[in-house]
């Protein structure tokens, strides 16, 4: 077959496929397609930088996992607030039945416009999630958590019954069904997950995440969040410092880490992020324990410098603007 006939046959095939499956179902990559990936800011400047595209990619699956009390829910609540600030609709599938509305509100989540579901079984949770995604009406959906998605057979069965592999099969089927729909609807789908220890592992990492391997494979971004240290004011514990590592990314170079301060009651410390990044970019000078901008002293020690910025919102906003401009981040 000549090149001309091949081209005509290809054009005909493309038209037939588009007619059968709808516009956009198939295309040539060079046909004016937008190769840039849309993103919703994570609510953390440091994490937006680590993610490489300024936030969570739309139309993709994201897994956030880590030990208990490391900041997983806080991280996702900030993302939800960020999506709502951009005019997006957010759904929260609360399989753990543990959402604290007051804390969510304190972090900026608009509770009046938050779509909330507290399902009884794993199948119900995933069916609700799929229906919401298919509707095309939401911009972000959060499932909290994969470990709490209990298959119906396990709930209905006896405590002594063996249900090995049920949850993994359920998640595998859900991922196969949902991944295409998530991509078409341009939704950010965030799955929160916990960490478990494999029994009898002598070498290598004994830690694993529940729900089988499907979520690992289908996720475009996997974030591991771990508590690094406590933040104290005198003897009182007022927050934690956590490290978020981009373990996997199909949209940007992975293995970057963001360090964030999570303050009890208020969430991610904006002043802490801006201060650290300003020092990195030499916008703020750090000499010994002192922080200063030219002749203006911000304070001795990181906590005092953070407080100084919080007391001077104009200076904080100015530094944040410079940081965002340098890293090409949107608000």
From Swiss-Prot:
It is found in: Cytoplasm. Can catalyze the hydrolysis of ATP in the presence of single-stranded DNA, the ATP-dependent uptake of single-stranded DNA by duplex DNA, and the ATP-dependent hybridization of homologous single-stranded DNAs. It interacts with LexA causing its activation and leading to its autocatalytic cleavage. The lineage of its organism: Bacteria, Bacillati, Mycoplasmatota, Mollicutes, Acholeplasmatales. It comes from Acholeplasma laidlawii. The keyword DNA-binding applies. PANTHER family: MITOCHONDRIAL DNA REPAIR PROTEIN RECA HOMOLOG-RELATED, RECA. It comes from the Bacteria. GO terms for molecular function: ATP binding; ATP hydrolysis activity; ATP-dependent DNA damage sensor activity; damaged DNA binding; single-stranded DNA binding. Keywords: ATP-binding, Cytoplasm, DNA damage, DNA recombination, DNA repair, DNA-binding, Nucleotide-binding, SOS response. Disulfide bonds: none annotated. This is Protein RecA. NCBIfam families: tigrfam_recA. ATP binds at residues 66-73. Belongs to the RecA family. CDD domains: RecA. GO terms for biological process: DNA recombination; DNA repair; SOS response. GO terms for cellular component: cytosol.
